[in-house]
């Protein structure tokens, strides 16, 4: 990138250190506790699928959208706010034609929704051209209830960046586009592909190969550190994934990754990593992909491992006090984004156990994750993937999900039905 006067983008910190790039390594099933996916449909699973399909509160894409994906939502001021990305030109998930979106509607009149473009391909930012748009989320700080932070990925000139715009709930207006920052130790770079690599290398920290899209996960949990509230979540790019934290949702600090530190283990993790912090521990779940790729994202010649995905995701825990990873558990899983939620002081994982037509709920045993138990694994009778589960202001629970990449859909459900004996 050619940096301009008064540019919002900044050069990376310089370092002479040689990067350490960790390989993708197959997770041997016989070395770990395994929680298998099951296809048998229990009455509980059937009831969950029926409730989700019958209690749809609305779809939030534009009628003219031909593709939409990756939803996040929140409630404020008697409205629901939903983020996603969409393609209005073709039915492909193609960042060359995608826009980052925020939609909102009154809870008592969902059909009366407004949809705003947050960023589109072709837009000019600080003199630079947006060439691709990808993963889009929305976040809120506990001490800033009037604003929603809309974070998204864009290829600007020749590099992917994490960018944000602040949406004011009262005025329904979006602020200017600015750049998130990525901090490792004392190194602070733009939150970009090179910014991540350089900041990690500067601090002597390795990473797995990165490619294309950079993501930040949609679920925030918080922890007080030295009198300051930090919000935790996951970040990822290709095979690289890590825990990050922030006190302002603008600058994100690196915390840990499963291939580094005490208890680190080799893995084939890929893309979205669900993170939930409670009791000074970060619970962590991520899908895997059994194919080795090089630094440029190309398959390594001679690698004969499965290139069609992996049947197991990884469940582990990172102790924030001891800075140590727990031995992982392999959970039957397909290729989808997952999400944790706390309900009545119990932690649950929502994921895709069989394929993207199934939703599974796993009760996490926080004393011993190897004793975690399947609540249900439901055939949703159609496309239902990338679940995100959230409370409204009155304690009701909703789930957003993608349907065939045609709809951003949200349903209300009663959790208690599925965990009671």
Where are these regions (language model features)?
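Beta-rich carbohydrate-recognition and catalytic domains
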Residues: 3-4, 8, 16-66, 74-131, ...
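C-terminal regions of proteins
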Residues: 383-387
């Amino acid at each position: 990138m050619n940096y301009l006067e008064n540019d919002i983008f900044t050069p990376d910190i310089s370092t002479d250190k040689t990067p350490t790039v960790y390989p993708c390594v197959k997770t041997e099933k016989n070395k770990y506790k395994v929680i298998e996916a099951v296809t048998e449909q229990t009455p509980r699973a059937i009831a969950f699928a029926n409730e989700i399909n019958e209690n749809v509160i609305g779809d939030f894409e534009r009628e003219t959208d031909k593709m939409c994906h990756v939803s996040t939502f929140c409630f404020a001021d008697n409205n629901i706010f939903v983020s996603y990305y969409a393609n209005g030109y073709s039915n492909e998930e193609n960042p060359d034609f995608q826009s980052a979106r925020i939609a909102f509607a009154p809870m008592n009149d969902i059909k009366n929704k407004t949809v705003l473009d947050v960023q589109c391909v072709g837009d000019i930012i600080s003199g630079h051209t947006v060439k691709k748009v990808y993963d889009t989320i929305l976040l809120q700080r506990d001490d800033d209830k009037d604003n929603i932070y809309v974070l998204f990925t864009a290829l600007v000139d020749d590099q992917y960046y994490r960018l944000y715009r602040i949406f004011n709930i009262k005025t329904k207006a979006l602020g200017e586009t600015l750049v998130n920052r990525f901090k490792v130790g004392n190194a602070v770079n733009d939150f970009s592909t090179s910014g991540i690599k350089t900041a990690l290398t500067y601090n002597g920290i390795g990473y797995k190969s990165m490619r294309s899209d950079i993501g930040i996960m949609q679920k925030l949990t918080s922890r007080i550190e030295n009198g300051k509230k930090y919000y935790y979540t996951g970040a990822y790019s290709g095979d690289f994934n890590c825990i990050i934290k922030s006190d302002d949702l603008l600058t994100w600090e690196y915390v840990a990754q499963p291939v580094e530190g005490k208890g680190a283990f080799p893995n084939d993790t890929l893309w979205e990593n669900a993170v939930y912090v409670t009791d000074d521990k970060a619970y962590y779940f991520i899908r895997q992909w059994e194919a080795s790729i090089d630094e440029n994202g190309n398959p390594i010649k001679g690698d004969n491992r499965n290139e069609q995905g992996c049947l197991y995701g990884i469940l582990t825990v990172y102790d924030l006090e001891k800075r140590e990873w727990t031995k992982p558990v392999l959970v039957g899983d397909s290729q989808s984004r997952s999400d944790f939620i706390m309900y009545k002081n119990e932690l649950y994982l929502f994921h895709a156990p069989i394929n993207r037509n199934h939703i599974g709920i796993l009760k996490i045993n926080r004393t011993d994750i190897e004793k975690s138990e399947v609540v249900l694994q439901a055939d949703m009778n159609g496309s239902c993937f990338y679940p995100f589960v959230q409370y409204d202001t009155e304690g009701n629970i909703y789930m957003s999900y993608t349907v065939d990449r045609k709809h951003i859909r949200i349903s209300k459900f009663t959790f208690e039905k599925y965990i009671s004996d």
